[in-house]
Swiss-Prot record:
Keyword 4Fe-4S: no
Protein known as: Transcription activator GAGA
Annotated source species: Drosophila melanogaster (Fruit fly)
Residue positions, PTM Phosphothreonine: 237
Cellular compartments annotated: Nucleus; Chromosome
UniProt region (Disordered), positions on chain: 298-343, 364-404
Length: 581
């Protein structure tokens, strides 16, 4: 018997269902070809889109509108253990759970509309209700009536899906919100981002833990607003620099036990930056002040019932540039800049009320520059005064042996001018006096032989050269002091060190002449050297003023007496040495 040519052969895979289920389970265990991730309770579970869509119409509508290759579905309000059990049920068709976990598992299955676990399935056509059989899930030691009663008392839920575009990530964020009638609110958020890793996205969208509401610290002078039971409060915050505001409405629920909702808008504009943070506490409502960066003002938020006086708009105006006046007792805390804060002087440790005055304090108290004073004390402690204004001599002289200060008259008369003498000139004068005494001692010693005379002449020459070098240094170091009298004239005052040096040179020249003449014809060459040296002294003396000559003549007798005494002492010493020899 032959078969027809158009007959079809039926090939049957005996264990098709078992083999396919086992193959899908292996792919899931090894993580191969997974194209989506479910996350809940801080854990993530890789899965396959085709399996999830076949098991849940809700996930089918959610994932087919997602162009992302590997979306990450965040399930808020679903326990991680329940999600793991649901995936086990989807991939294997059965799951074993504890009796305590069964209500939460069935509630999660109802939220996700998992086929085979949802007790009721609502269609869009005729809204008919289909019952499902749960006998295969109920163990023998559980009561069937009790389980069905538990499922019946669970709140009915309605699922809504919404698609939101995200421009920054160039993708789509699918947001699904599950609302309940009496048990509160539950949210299921689906996010897609191909650029980020799955784990990073999971950590970013983990469900937030319950924390205490943050209340920004305020100054003790800031006003506080307490909550009034059964009252609806309307808060207004500025949204732009033109004064237009957005109204934040806080609604009360269930009478006195209302739930306060707050928002934290951040508004940025070109002219100024305003940041408003409002935090409400059911027991003590303390609004956080809004800081204006442009004007530097701090504006505390106030309720409409206390500040608007019956105005239902709920918009609070923000001052722009000027500070608004407030009645006494309600002043706003002023923001103090760094320059207005107190500072401490690092030298005297004085407290300055404003830090901008610290520099002025240092300049006046610690680093003040000495100005021109009218009167200055001399080193001897005595003040030298000028003569009478009618005489107009203007010559000042001290009581010392050497003239210390010499003034040059100006065209106008000086009134009450006093000059401080130069300490450097005094030291130079003392050195010159010592050198002069040594010269006198060397010149008074007369030797019997010509060799001693030549040695004396050489010593005198060396001393004269030293004096010339000192005079050059003195001329470089001399300073001219400017003196301003009462009439506004400026005169110059010079020290009399130059006059004293010239007088000393003259005395040295005279002494050299005496020594050369006392030597006689035996020392002809030294005589000519002494004469040449005295010529320089005569030239310097000829350039001196008459005042210097008078001062020198007054001092000359004293110097001669000193020289005679020194000569006598030297002669006595020579006689003693000769006697000893």
């Amino acid at each position: 018997m032959s078969l027809p040519m158009n007959s079809l052969y039926s090939l049957t895979w005996g264990d098709y269902g078992t083999s396919l289920v086992s193959a899908i389970q292996l792919l899931r265990c090894h993580g191969d070809l997974v194209d989506c991730t479910l996350a809940a309770g801080g854990r993530s579970f890789p899965a396959h889109k085709i399996v999830l869509c076949a098991a849940s119409p809700f996930l089918l509508d959610l994932l087919k509108n997602t162009p992302c290759k590997h979306p990450v579905v965040m399930l808020a309000g679903v326990n991680a253990n329940d999600l793991e059990a649901l995936l086990e049920f989807v991939y294997r068709g059965e799951v074993s759970v504890d009796h305590a976990q069964l209500p939460s598992l069935l509630q999660a299955a109802q939220c996700l509309n998992i086929q085979g676990l949802a007790p009721q399935t609502v269609t869009k056509d005729d809204y008919t209700t289909h019952s499902i059989q749960l006998q295969h899930m109920i163990p023998q030691h559980h009561d069937q009536d009790q389980l069905i009663a538990t499922i019946a008392t669970a709140p009915q839920q309605t699922v809504h899906a919404q698609v939101v575009e995200d421009i920054h990530h160039q993708g789509q964020i699918l947001q699904a919100t599950t609302q309940t009638n009496a048990a509160g609110q539950q949210q299921t958020i689906v996010t897609t981002d191909a650029a980020k890793h799955d784990q990073a996205v999971i950590q970013a969208f983990l469900p937030a833990r319950k924390r205490k509401p943050r209340v920004k610290k305020m100054s003790p002078t800031a006003p506080k607003i307490s909550k009034v039971e059964g009252m609806d409060t309307i808060m207004g915050t500025p949204t732009s620099s033109h004064g237009s505001g957005s109204v934040q409405q806080v609604l009360g629920e269930n009478g006195a036990e209302g739930q306060l909702l707050s928002s934290t808008p951040i508004i940025k504009s070109e002219g100024q930056k305003v940041e408003t943070i409002v935090t409400m506490d059911p027991n003590n409502m303390i609004p956080v002040t809004s800081a204006n960066a442009a004007t530097g003002e701090i504006t505390p938020a106030q309720g409409a019932t206390g500040s608007s006086g019956g105005n239902t708009s709920g918009v609070l105006s923000t001052p722009k540039a000027k500070r608004a006046k407030h009645p006494p007792g309600t002043e706003k805390p002023r923001s103090r800049s760094q320059s207005e804060q107190p500072a401490t002087c690092p030298i005297c440790y004085a407290v300055i009320r404003q830090s901008r005055n610290l520099r002025r304090h240092l300049e006046l108290r610690h680093f003040a520059k000495p100005g021109v004073k009218k009167e200055k004390k001399t080193t001897s402690g005595k003040k030298s005064s000028s003569g009478s204004s009618g005489s107009g001599s203007g010559a000042l002289s001290s009581s010392g042996s050497v003239p210390q200060v010499q003034t040059v008259q100006s065209l106008h008369t000086l009134q009450g001018v006093q000059v401080k003498k130069d300490p450097d000139a005094q030291q130079q004068q003392q050195q010159q006096q010592q050198q002069q005494q040594q010269q006198q001692q060397a010149m008074t010693v007369s030797g019997a032989t010509g060799g001693q005379v030549q040695q004396q002449v050489q010593q005198v020459q060396q001393q004269v050269q030293q004096q010339q070098q000192q005079q050059q240094q003195q001329q470089q170091q001399l300073q001219h002091h400017q003196i301003i009298d009462s009439s506004g004239n400026i005169t110059t005052a010079t020290t009399s060190a130059q006059a004293a040096a010239a007088a000393q040179q003259q005395a040295a020249g005279q002494q050299q002449q005496l020594v050369a003449q006392s030597d006689g014809s035996e020392s002809g060459a030294p005589l000519s050297i002494a004469q040449v040296q005295t010529l320089q002294g005569h030239q310097i003396i000829g350039n001196l003023n008459q005042v210097n000559m008078t001062d020198f003549q007054q001092q000359q007798p004293q110097q001669q007496q000193q020289q005679q005494q020194q000569q006598q002492q030297q002669q006595q010493q020579q006689q003693q040495t000769q006697q000893t020899l």
